[in-house]
Design a protein with these regions (language model features):
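Catalytic core of the metallo-beta-lactamase
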Residues: 1-58, 116-184, 211-212
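Short active-site segment of divalent metal-dependent hydrolases/proteases
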Residues: 85, 167, 231
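N-terminal active-site wall of soluble small-molecule enzyme domains
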Residues: 63
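Short coil/turn segments at beta-strand junctions that form active-site/ligand-binding loops
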Residues: 74, 148, 157, 221-222
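Cap/insert and terminal regions of metallo-dependent hydrolase folds
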Residues: 17-18, 29-30, 59-60, 77, ...
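Active-site HxH/HxHxD metal-binding segment of metal-dependent hydrolases
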Residues: 66-131
Length: 248
């Protein structure tokens, strides 16, 4: 696999705000026409009001990461935010059998098509369940004909948690050939956004996406966490407007 600069240290909890952490993982191989490219991975951990932990898009299992998470509290929820982010939930469910595994739109069908066995316990919706409504808000970002995503807001810190709706790859972490490809896709830092192939899946349905964007902007996020690339740890609302200008 082509080498790509990762966000070391890997498999370590990195505080973002009180009760909110990131953990960066190894690269994965993402299929594109004609081959594969490496993607850095990242998960988010939130401490809920009851002291339990909420794990968004769990990365590859790692003993050191498990130990660090266990020191924070009991894992109660394992979240697949979209149908591309689910591959490690089965391993995490094995480690935390009492945790509830939450399915995103289309993920059950996607996992079955990839012959990956994942047992989900509940489905994500357009509003937060009582399990975490005090700590997190959420919405179902609609409009794509291919990939819909559940978006979350950490209420206390004003942190928006996205997965693939924005990708923001730093040029210094990419080999030259991949840098050009990512620039053409429109996902190169500092002007990261959804890649062009994903934006095209909203053709004829942008009205749905604009309504979802309006809800996110109404949250007035202060920072934006991304699964792939550099996060926006300040000016979150402005970065959100910039990254979604293609919906205009």
């Amino acid at each position: 696999m082509i080498p790509v600069g990762l966000y070391e240290p890997l498999n370590a909890l990195k505080p973002v705000a009180p009760g909110l952490w990131l953990a960066d993982g190894p690269a994965i191989r993402m299929a594109i026409p004609g081959g594969h490219i490496p993607f850095p991975t990242r998960m988010t951990v939130v401490r809920l009001a009851d002291g339990g932990l909420w794990c968004h898009s769990p990365i590859a299992p790692d003993a050191g990461l498990f130990a660090a998470i266990d020191a924070l509290g009991p894992v109660r929820h394992l979240v697949s935010p979209n149908m591309l982010h689910y591959a490690h939930i089965a391993a995490w469910k094995q480690r935390y059998p009492d945790a509830v595994a939450w399915a995103s739109p289309g993920v059950r069908e996607r996992a079955a098509g990839q012959h990956i066995a994942v047992a989900f316990d509940a489905d994500l919706d357009d509003a937060p369940p009582p399990d975490w409504a005090e700590t997190l808000d959420q919405l179902h970002f609609r409009g794509s004909r291919v990939l819909e995503e559940i978006v979350f807001l950490h209420r206390d810190s004003g942190t928006l948690i996205l997965t693939d709706l924005i990708e923001n790859f730093e040029p210094s972490r990419l080999p030259a050939g991949m840098r050009l490809l990512v620039r053409l896709a429109g996902s190169l830092d500092p002007d990261g956004k959804a890649p062009v192939d994903m934006r095209l899946t909203y053709f004829g349905r942008k009205r749905l996406a604009r309504a979802c964007l309006a809800r996110m902007l109404a949250w007035r996020p202060r920072r934006v966490i991304l699964a792939h690339g550099r996060c926006y740890l300040q000016d979150g609302e402005a970065e959100l407007r910039r990254a979604f200008r293609w919906l205009a």
